[in-house]
Amino acid sequence: MNHIDVTQRINELRTLIRRYDYHYYVLDDPIVSDAEYDALMNELRALEAAHPELITPDSPTQRVSGTPASQFAKVQHPQPMLSLGNAFTTTDLLAWRDRVLRLLGQDTAVAYVVEPKIDGLAVALTYHDGQFVQGATRGDGEVGEDVTANLRTISSIPLLLHPPDGGHDRDVPTALPSLIEVRGEVYMRTADFEALNDRLAAAGEKIFANPRNAAAGSLRQKDPAITAARPLRFFAYGVGPVEGVELTGQWQTLRYLRMLGFPVNQDVRRFTDFDEVLAYCEQWMARRDELTYEADGMVIKIDDFAQQRELGVVGRDPRWAIAFKFPPREAITRLLNITVNVGRTGVVTPNAELEPVQIGGVIVRNASLHNADYIAQRDIRIGDYVIVKRAGDVIPYVVGPVVARRDGSERPWQFPTHCPACGSPLEREPGEAAWRCNNFGICPAQLVRRLEHFASRAALDIVGLGERQAELFVQRGLVRDVADLFYLKAEDFAGLEGFGPKRIANLLNAIDAARQRPLDRLIVGLGIRYVGSVAAQALVNSLGSLDAIMNARQEELEQIPGIGPVVAASIVDFFAHPENRQLIEKLRAAGVQMNAGPQRERKSDVLAGQTFVLTGTLPSLTREQASALIIAHGGKVTDSVSKKTNYVVAGVNAGSKLAKAQQLGIPVLDEAALLALIGER
């Protein structure tokens, strides 16, 4: 073929492949076999290889390109990618509907667009004159990460927009936008996730816990070739900035996106009657297992963009949209055995060993049984079929037995009378549910957990010291308390499995750096009962040194904001034990920081008089950083939610504090909303 013929054939092949991609990914209606498709793609690759001057960035062959990135660049979103407020019951949804109508006017006609809430990773795709130029993760809603090269590898994301023809939708624009930011979710279908995990397991690699983690981990690979090998998909659900066309509503926007070549959820619906909205949500709550992907709820949006603008945004949550969350998933499986774990404070916790069962995309083999009373009250027996729930779709726990399925082979379980690690008698304080091993100084299980806690990110942050290393150190007798870490030498690691010269040097450097951590982090690391990051910061801010804290009287401690009688008594009791004071002196002799550093600069009084409670894991700030930020702007941070709490800042895996805040009607912020509140974005 001459050059003109080659150019013409390449263009024909690209047009055909894009058409077949559109039918496969958008219309879900393949019109050629895989073999025919592969033959066309191979022909295109061969022609482009022979004529590299004809390769263009939007060619279907150019999805995987570039070299592995060392890190992802930050991307400022031109418009914030907002989070959604949550509704957990139909009562919550009706309350949201009533607020909308109160703001718009009771007689205002309102339409709602409803679709399943895919549990994936939110991204924004930018197109200039129809060509894909940049893709970014949501990040904190204001700033995300540039993952353009990886997003290009996802076949369901068009590199070149499909010219819209309008079809039967006369209200849908027929022009290509000069600029459009398309927002949606990168996800992995359940079947693809399971197949990926099977391949990883067969190769001896670490498997993913659930499809969302798999999607997020695959998209954030530094090498686009790895992302390309993962079965990622994309659903579009909205837009950011748009230029060159006018979009007036959510329903119209979704149809327009579909015409441009984006997959849009087939289960999206538009309703004008809110009773139909409720029925549709309840229908999918009952049928969620029929979905080919993991969904944790339904998203309801006001259709009309003018009404959306009128309703506006509160914090980081739009008033014009809400997420109806499905209840925690549960399953029935057999309880094989009950074991106990000894924590760093000596609390002995029962753990259920289960026949593996899938709950919400995760294989569950172990679950919490809380305490001895919980087991006794529910008459949970070894061999029982039990109901297992994942609280917040994260933490599995046993709800109770299915008594009707008992066959007489089940065995009652007795809580141990002695510590399984050191043999000391277990004790229980009056009014408490927990049994404890009080052999604080000798119990090896407690020491392992204390070492883990001492080295954790919230405490001294000793990178390279985790559960496995702590167990090795205790088994070999290298440490008898946390202070011994600072006396370790390179020769102590001789013959220790997994410790080569480089790893030893890195760990010793991390331990050395831990000597200069802020005093509040050391206090957290000591593991004083009831004293977390917030209380530790309050102690340091008020008293300034570990000596002052050690020697403070209970009534003096109770005067510190955020330190109540129970916490104060626990602090006094901890330092009343001679072995704990000896530990402090040993740490002091090792050069560990015992005094507060320079006072944190007060940045503003914007949060003066406001009380905050933190719960869950925030996207970029640690709990300590968030607390310090609030305090620096005049706010106060406490550990418990009450009517006096002004805001609860909630992250991933938020627990009972979030539930109590919602019960009391206390405003809930995410990290981005907190930063917006204090003017730090």
UniProtKB/Swiss-Prot annotation:
Residues binding NAD(+): 34-38, 83-84, 115, 138, 185, 301, 325
UniProt GO molecular function: DNA binding; DNA ligase (NAD+) activity; metal ion binding
Entry cofactors: Mg(2+); Mn(2+)
Active site: 117 (n6-amp-lysine intermediate)
Top class in the EC scheme: ligase
InterPro entries: BRCT_dom, BRCT_dom_sf, DisA/LigA_HHH, DNA_ligase, DNA_ligase_AS, DNAligase_adenylation, DNAligase_N, Hlx-hairpin-Hlx_DNA-bd_motif
Coiled-coil portions: none
Keyword vocabulary terms for this entry: DNA damage, DNA repair, DNA replication, Ligase, Magnesium, Manganese, Metal-binding, NAD, Zinc
SMART domains xref list: BRCT, HhH1, LIGANc
Chain residues that bind Zn(2+): 419, 422, 437, 443
Listed Pfam families: BRCT, DNA_ligase_aden, DNA_ligase_OB, DNA_ligase_ZBD, HHH_2, Nlig-Ia
Catalytic activity, as annotated: NAD(+) + (deoxyribonucleotide)n-3'-hydroxyl + 5'-phospho-(deoxyribonucleotide)m = (deoxyribonucleotide)n+m + AMP + beta-nicotinamide D-nucleotide
Domain of life where this protein originates: Bacteria
Residues annotated as domain BRCT: 602-681
EC number of the protein: 6.5.1.2
A Gene Ontology cellular-component term: cytosol
GO BP term, example: DNA replication
Family, per entry: Belongs to the NAD-dependent DNA ligase family. LigA subfamily.
Described purpose of this protein according to its UniProt entry: DNA ligase that catalyzes the formation of phosphodiester linkages between 5'-phosphoryl and 3'-hydroxyl groups in double-stranded DNA using NAD as a coenzyme and as the energy source for the reaction. It is essential for DNA replication and repair of damaged DNA.
Identification of the protein by name: DNA ligase
Organism: Chloroflexus aggregans (strain MD-66 / DSM 9485)
Name of the gene: ligA
